[in-house]
Amino acid sequence: MTIAFQLAVFALIATSSILLISVPVVFASPDGWSSKKNVVFSGTSLWIGLVFLVGILNSLIY
């Protein structure tokens, strides 16, 4: 269970880092938002799911 928790935390950190870089780039590009809207929403949904997963796994471990 600890390995799953550590992998979930790593995935959350990696997703956060990717979104931290990619979202401003999408908003700064001329046609970025209209063409990359689904990618941003998918990344945000993944991030929210990982936050809940880390919370659930944390409550099971500690």
From Swiss-Prot:
It comes from the Eukaryota. GO terms for biological process: photosynthesis; photosystem II stabilization. The chain crosses the membrane at residues 8-28, 41-61. It is a multi-pass membrane protein. One of its GO terms (cellular component) is chloroplast thylakoid membrane. InterPro entries: PSII_PsbZ, PSII_PsbZ_sf. The keyword Cell inner membrane does not apply. The keyword Plastid applies. Keywords: Chloroplast, Membrane, Photosynthesis, Photosystem II, Plastid, Reaction center, Thylakoid, Transmembrane, Transmembrane helix. It is found in: Plastid, Chloroplast thylakoid membrane. Belongs to the PsbZ family. May control the interaction of photosystem II (PSII) cores with the light-harvesting antenna, regulates electron flow through the 2 photosystem reaction centers. PSII is a light-driven water plastoquinone oxidoreductase, using light energy to abstract electrons from H(2)O, generating a proton gradient subsequently used for ATP formation. PSII is composed of 1 copy each of membrane proteins PsbA, PsbB, PsbC, PsbD, PsbE, PsbF, PsbH, PsbI, PsbJ, PsbK, PsbL, PsbM, PsbT, PsbY, PsbZ, Psb30/Ycf12, at least 3 peripheral proteins of the oxygen-evolving complex and a large number of cofactors. It forms dimeric complexes. This is Photosystem II reaction center protein Z.
